[in-house]
């Protein structure tokens, strides 16, 4: 991009983030690495996480208004469609598109302050993930917008880019191995949601109210919202590997795969009191470790955690159930089950034989990078695509539903524990991920964009 390297003391990296746990943790990991390498870093997020951000040595700036408030948290324990359709539409309108004006203003305020305090000699590189749309108004012609030297989109979902003949999770096209029937109906519904005039019209109205020129909003001029999130940047760095995605012969050069982040989450000051007893057991006491977790949003334990506990209560395994800030479980636990509110996955998965999860891109990428086979549930947002791709790679059994039956989980876990070929396949995938260094690649792009003419 440029032949003259800009020195680190001339570069200021701004990272935009929601304060949802999984997204903020990735911003902190990237920010901490940049700070360690000598860059100045400002992280924008909700006011409630100021202390977390400042604990890594980053400067903090608040996301304002809707961008800094409590994230939309649908009640995922509602019935299946049509409610599920309403949930996805609500999430797109209220969580992805609705906060764009406040995200834009928050970032522009920081850019203006840096220009006033540090001058034109400071090269600002901005990055965020697909949740944040702060740069979209800049690309579509917002009046008076300050444009940073470079814009990086960190890919924390499957690729949102539309492509000729290639399915994306936003277009509702399943992988070739996906069964028909209700799953096909689900994907058809998802396609209708993500390509609907309702969603696109809402996106256009938000931009129109921000003063985007009318010519830029004419039919055919404005790409679909999710596609915009993948293309309105100088570099889209997917936290995955090419083998996870369908090949795209027409993919723009801006799309690059950088592998999974090496860690997400900070090591807790003290692990559960039972940690050594379970993790470092020897001899007959050593059991295969099955971890079950539902993440921070879809955390109704009757969907997955409780059915898994029931399924494995008589099996010769050690079960670790993590709630990840979810509701308390008020049941008597079998003797082979241990409960924890939260243990960082980068620690826990290194000792795990099978992960039972409702999936999601970040969790699946970490498990793949560590060679851990999975039993996956979950169908909303990107989860069905993500989970079906993991299954297509040979690393998972995808149950393809939101609420599971104990007998189905039991069969899947036992199949994985007895399947040596699947274990070998997971180790092969782990070796693929080991070829990448996500943090170093992100640094390379920061340097390249800051140094471009």
Swiss-Prot record:
InterPro entries: EryCIII-like_C (IPR010610), Glycosyltransferase_28 (IPR050426)
Gene3D superfamilies xrefs: Glycogen Phosphorylase B
Pathway it works in: Secondary metabolite biosynthesis
Pfam families, sorted: EryCIII-like_C
Keyword Chloroplast: no
UniProt EC number: 2.4.1.-
UniProt xrefs under SUPFAM superfamilies: UDP-Glycosyltransferase/glycogen phosphorylase
Swiss-Prot/TrEMBL keywords: Glycosyltransferase, Transferase
Catalytic EC class: transferase
Gene Ontology terms, MF aspect: hexosyltransferase activity
Similarity annotation: Belongs to the UDP-glycosyltransferase family.
Protein function: UDP-glucosyltransferase; part of the cluster that mediates the biosynthesis of a highly modified cyclo-arginine-tryptophan dipeptide (cRW). The first step of the pathway is perfornmed by the arginine-containing cyclodipeptide synthase (RCPDS) avaA that acts as the scaffold-generating enzyme and is responsible for formation of the cyclo-Arg-Trp (cRW) diketopiperazine. AvaB then acts as a multifunctional flavoenzyme that is responsible for generating the cyclo-Arg-formylkynurenine DKP, which can be deformylated by avaC.
Name assigned to this protein: UDP-glucosyltransferase avaP
Species: Aspergillus versicolor
């Amino acid at each position: 991009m440029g032949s003259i390297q800009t020195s680190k003391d001339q570069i200021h990296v701004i990272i935009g983030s929601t304060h949802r746990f999984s997204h903020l943790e990735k911003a902190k990991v990237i920010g901490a690495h940049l700070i360690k390498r000598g860059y100045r870093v400002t992280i924008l997020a909700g006011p409630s996480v100021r202390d977390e951000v400042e604990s890594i040595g980053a400067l903090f700036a608040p996301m304002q208004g809707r961008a800094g408030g409590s994230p939309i948290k649908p009640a995922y324990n509602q019935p299946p469609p049509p409610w599920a359709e309403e949930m996805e539409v609500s999430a797109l309108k209220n969580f992805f598109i609705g906060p764009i004006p406040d995200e834009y203003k928050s970032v522009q305020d920081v850019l203006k302050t840096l220009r006033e305090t540090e001058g034109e000699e400071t090269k600002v590189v901005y990055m965020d993930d697909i949740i944040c749309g702060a740069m979209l108004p800049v690309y579509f012609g917002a009046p008076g917008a300050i444009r940073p030297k470079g814009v990086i989109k960190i890919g924390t979902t499957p690729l949102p880019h539309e492509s000729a003949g290639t399915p994306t999770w936003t277009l509702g096209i399943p992988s070739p191995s996906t069964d028909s029937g209700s799953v096909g109906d689900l994907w058809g519904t998802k396609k209708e949601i993500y390509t609907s005039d309702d969603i696109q019209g809402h996106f256009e109205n938000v931009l129109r109210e921000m003063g985007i020129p009318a010519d830029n909003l004419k039919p055919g001029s404005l790409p679909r919202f999710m596609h915009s999130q993948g293309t309105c940047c100088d570099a889209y760095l997917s936290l995955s590997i090419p083998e996870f995605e369908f090949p795209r012969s027409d993919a723009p050069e801006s799309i690059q795969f950088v592998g999974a982040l090496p860690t997400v989450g900070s090591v807790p000051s003290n692990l559960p009191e039972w940690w050594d007893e379970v993790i470092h057991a020897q001899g007959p006491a050593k059991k295969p470790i099955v971890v079950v977790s539902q993440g921070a949003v879809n955390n109704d334990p009757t969907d997955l955690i409780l059915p898994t506990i029931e399924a494995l209560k008589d099996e010769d395994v050690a079960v670790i159930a993590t709630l990840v800030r979810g509701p308390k479980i008020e049941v008597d636990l079998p003797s082979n089950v241990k409960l924890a509110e939260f243990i960082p996955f980068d620690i826990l998965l290194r000792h795990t034989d099978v992960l039972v999860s409702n999936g999601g891109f970040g969790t699946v990428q970490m498990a793949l990078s560590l060679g851990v086979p999975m039993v996956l549930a979950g169908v909303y947002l990107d989860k069905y695509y993500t989970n079906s791709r993991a299954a297509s790679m040979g690393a998972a059994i995808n149950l393809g539903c939101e609420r599971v039956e104990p007998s189905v989980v039991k069969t899947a876990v036992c199949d994985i524990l007895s399947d040596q070929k699947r274990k070998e396949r997971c180790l092969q995938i782990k070796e693929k991920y080991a070829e990448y260094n996500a943090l170093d690649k992100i640094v390379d792009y920061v340097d390249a964009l800051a140094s471009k003419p």
